[in-house]
Structures are given as structure tokens and as C-alpha cells.
Regions:
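Conserved active-site segments centered on acidic
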Residues: 1-81, 146-150
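Phosphate-binding/catalytic loops
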Residues: 84, 90-150
Length: 150
């Protein structure tokens, strides 16, 4: 089983959006038996909170299924159990390197690196641009799917 873990600052905007977008792509490809997807936070700030309402609205508008959830923090077990750990920006990467003691198993990447681009998924919590975040996330998730399934 390929285990993909998306990580962002608080686990209420970008990483849950990526989780639900990726789950939708995996389901539409009929690959649920091969790929599991989850998300978590690199910080404690939003632990216990559900996906941010504007993200839920956008997912609903796009026809992407989502569930009620609670933000959770990245753990050492996440590192051991995940095949790919995918952050959204350089801050996430720094946090993940710190939390994994330098990523010795080379599991950490940034989402848009999968598309060949060297840029971040901007945090819509600050930009209020959920549509652009969605487009970047969808593009990155599609590239991941192509990259992990031969």
C-alpha cells in the first residue's frame, strides 16, 4: 500500500484540501486498494479544528467529497508509516526536516515539485485565494498519481 501524507502549517486549509482532492482522484482511478491518503499539521495551532469553512465550500462547489475531521499533529509514527510526506511550502519542509531529524529516509517533498515546478502552494489562510490553492493542489495531486503508479 502506498501511503501519502500531506502536511501544512495547521492542517485546516491546504493539507486537508490536498487530502480530499487526492482521495477523489484515487477513487476515480479505482486505486483505493493501492493508495491511502491522509493529512496532518506541522504545528499545534489548529489541532482539533475541522477543515476551514472556505475550503469546505470550495470542495463542495467542485464536487469533491469531504468528511468532518479534526486537525492533528505530525508524529514519528507518521514518518515511519508514510511512503510519501508532502508539504506545501518551504516552511513546511523546514518543519518536517526538524520533526524527522533531517528526513533520513528521503520521504519529504513539496507538492509542486511533483509537477516539475519549484514553487509553493500559497496559504489561502493569508491570501484568501482558495481557487488558486485548489488549482495548484489539483495539479500537484494529478502529478503525484502519475508519479507513483507506473
Amino acid at each position: 500500500m502506498i501511503k501519502i501524507l500531506f502536511v501544512c502549517h495547521g492542517n485546516i486549509c491546504r493539507s486537508p484540501m490536498a487530502e480530499f482532492v487526492m482521495k477523489d482522484l484515487v477513487a476515480k482511478a479505482g486505486l483505493e486498494h493501492l493508495i491511502s491518503v491522509s493529512s496532518c499539521a506541522a504545528t499545534y495551532e489548529e489541532i482539533g479544528n475541522d477543515t476551514y469553512p472556505p475550503v469546505r465550500r470550495l470542495l463542495n462547489e467542485k464536487g469533491i467529497p469531504f468528511t468532518k475531521r479534526e486537525a492533528r499533529i505530525f508524529t514519528p509514527a507518521d514518518y515511519e508509516e508514510s511512503t510519501y510526506i508532502i508539504g506545501m511550502d518551504d516552511e513546511n519542509r523546514r518543519d518536517l526536516y526538524r520533526l524527522t531529524k533531517g528526513d533520513p529516509q528521503k520521504k519529504v517533498s513539496l507538492l509542486l515539485e511533483w509537477t516539475g515546478e519549484n514553487r509553493s502552494v500559497a496559504d489561502p489562510w493569508y491570501t484568501d485565494d482558495y481557487e488558486t490553492a485548489y488549482r495548484d493542489i489539483r495539479e500537484g495531486c494529478a502529478a503525484i498519481l502519475k508519479g507513483v503508479i507506473p
